[in-house]
Amino acid sequence: MKEFFPVLHTAALFSGISDEELAAMLSCLGARIDTFPKGSRLLRAGESVEEVGLVLAGSALIVQEDIWGNRSILSKTGPGQTFAEVFACAPGAVLNVSVEAESAVTVMFLHIRRVLSVCPSACSYHSRFIRNLLSELAEKNLRLNEKLTHISEH
């Protein structure tokens, strides 16, 4: 996993976290890495998730489909960016979007339950990670709010 540390350090989730802390944190969070070919679905609408996805290489699209099969690309995620964090943080929430590989994509999945509970090892960087997660959620919420404001004006 150390080969991905340069990308992880660009991620808002790991802002202010050293290499040593990062290595310990990835273990604590049950980090796993998967690679998906172009066009494959990483997550499907209708599923529930417990993991945050963080793109390490390649890109993924957040796509919403209506009942007639019309697709809307809501966002694109690239290296250092996350997806599914809102759904993973809300126990029992069901995805209303799918995540698709725009290109071949490598993703690190982090188990959200381990993020939201107190670490049994009392990791000093655990609270920093939670602050980073909240900051990222707030920024995405603000961007969504701006889009809604723009759409409602027309």
Where are each of the predicted segments found?
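Glycine- and acidic-residue-biased ligand/ion/polar-headgroup-sensing regions
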Residues: 39, 50-68, 78-81
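Local beta-strand/beta-hairpin segments that build beta-sheet-rich folds
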Residues: 42, 74-75, 151
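Short phosphate-coordinating micro-motif centered on Lys-Gly-acidic
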Residues: 41-47
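Short, small/polar residue-rich loop motifs at catalytic or cofactor-binding pockets
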Residues: 28-29, 47-49
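Cyclic-nucleotide recognition modules
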Residues: 73-132
